[in-house]
Amino acid sequence: YRIYSKIVGAKVVFSKERNFKVSNDEILKKITKRTKIVFIANPNNPTGTYISKNQLLDLRKRLNKKILLVVDDAYFEYMLNEDYKSGLELFKNKNNVFILRTFSKIYGLASLRVGWGYGSKKIIDALYKIKPPFNVNKIAQQCAVESLKDKSFVKKSVKHNLDWAKKIQKEMNSYNIQTN
């Protein structure tokens, strides 16, 4: 998203992380009068860390109402932790939050470049003003729709990836490499 931000002339500012985790306090330190958007990938790629439900709610509460909080839920299917909730679950009817999802990860459709966003009508209307026509082709659309029907593939993929994550974590720990 950094490239798109620069195209439209936005200044991208990164906040410090603490132990590879996003910190609300560090984000808030970077907020200025000119801040328009705070963007969070939750869970984060590549660290795999995440912001808990309470942290995410706290961040939205502490941000100025005029600042849009964008939550990228690209990997939410892999989150089994009890203290995690997807952005969509937390902010379904909020005006100043926009949720992103992708078909690239769990559905394996990365090359089709298809996903979706959820937000208020005001945000959607603004996006339609800048959206190019024909930005997602019919084949990609049909693949996305069909992939939503295959619930067993999603379950199998989550299990496969989590099993491998445990194996990798165990191997790394055997070399005294700490993981999250």
In which residue ranges do the predicted regions lie?
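Short, structured coil segments at secondary-structure junctions
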Residues: 8-9, 93, 175
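Short beta-strands and strand-loop turn motifs
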Residues: 14-15, 37-43, 69-73, 180
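Active-site pre-lysine segment of PLP-dependent enzymes
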Residues: 22-34, 46-69, 75-106
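PLP-dependent aminotransferase-like
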Residues: 1-40
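PLP-dependent aminotransferase class I/II
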Residues: 96-173, 177-178
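Short glycine/serine/threonine/alanine-rich loop segments
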Residues: 10, 67, 177
